[in-house]
């Protein structure tokens, strides 16, 4: 029998226990696959549980000192506040599993064309530190592994979370084989921006028309210029007008059209693509889940994937 065309990395540990008043919407990691299964977009057997990412893979991107600080739960209170989560063995295991999920997706995408991690997109993690709810930079770890194993020669990271992928930009600032492209809120976190290979800062209140026009223009130019043979796509939904921190005016339909542009481009040029969910902080969890589910639905339609 042919292999299933739809590959999704997911583990129940993605939903990590947090204090009740914590602002991170951890529940979404449980609700996204539940909704997609309930509506028939996917089935249980398309969810693949990653193992924990080994030190060997992490150390291709992160420093040994940082990794051992995490293993020994030896970050200061200030460093933990910058990350936004209290360190624990359970949390570090979760982050390893999410990172391995993106690695598994990368190898699946080489075969299937596209693969999804229900979590991931931890683009604020630097080689030697974490911040902004990010501990290991899963895209960077997976990209470095693909390069090391000669599975890709030229990688394009498309970061459409509303916050700049500062950790990713810094990690790859001297790496010619990885091109970092970020469209993000100009006046949003992180307030000190790193230099991506291409940054498109967006004014507060940017609407669908402006956003989608910019994305179409720059993405096509990048495909021609960079000639990527692999894409990592961070499909954050914190660009929505409902988001508590986004500051943009992107509608739900505009968010769908954004995904369509990326997926149609990757599909048309037959470039393997890994998708990770990134951020989303709308007040209603249903809005966040619907926007993330739309990303799956859009890809399923464009790639003609079936459950």
What are these regions (language model features)?
Residues 4, 77-307:
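A general "terminal functional-core" signal
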Residues 41, 74-79:
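ATP-dependent kinase catalytic cores of phosphoinositide-metabolizing enzymes
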């Amino acid at each position: 029998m042919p292999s299933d065309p739809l590959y999704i990395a997911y583990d129940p540990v993605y939903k990590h226990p947090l204090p009740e008043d914590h602002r991170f919407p951890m529940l979404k990691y449980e609700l996204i696959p539940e909704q997609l299964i309930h509506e028939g977009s996917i089935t249980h057997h398309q969810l693949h549980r990653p193992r924990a990412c080994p030190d060997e893979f992490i150390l291709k991107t992160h420093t040994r000192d940082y990794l051992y600080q995490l293993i020994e739960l030896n970050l200061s209170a200030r460093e933990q506040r910058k990350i936004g989560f209290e360190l624990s063995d359970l949390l570090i295991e979760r982050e390893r599993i999410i990172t391995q999920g993106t690695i598994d997706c990368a190898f699946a995408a080489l075969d299937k064309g596209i693969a999804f991690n229900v979590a991931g997109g931890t683009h604020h993690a630097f080689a030697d530190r974490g911040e902004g709810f990010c501990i290991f930079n899963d895209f960077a770890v997976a990209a470095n592994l693909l390069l090391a194993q000669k599975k890709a020669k030229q990688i394009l990271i498309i970061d459409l979370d509303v916050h700049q992928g500062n950790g990713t930009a810094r990690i790859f600032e001297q790496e010619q084989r990885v091109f970092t492209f970020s469209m993000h809120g100009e006046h949003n976190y992180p307030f000190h921006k790193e230099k991506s290979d291409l940054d498109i800062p967006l004014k507060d209140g940017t609407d669908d028309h402006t956003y989608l026009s910019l994305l179409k223009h720059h993405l096509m130019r990048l495909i021609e210029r960079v000639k990527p043979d692999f894409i990592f796509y961070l499909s954050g939904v914190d660009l929505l007008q409902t988001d508590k921190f986004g500051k943009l005016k992107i509608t739900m339909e505009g968010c769908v059209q954004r995904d369509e542009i990326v997926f149609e481009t990757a599909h048309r040029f037959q470039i393997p693509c890994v998708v990770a969910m990134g951020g989303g902080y709308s007040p209603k969890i249903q809005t966040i889940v619907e926007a993330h589910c739309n990303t799956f639905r859009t890809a399923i339609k464009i790639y003609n994937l079936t459950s």
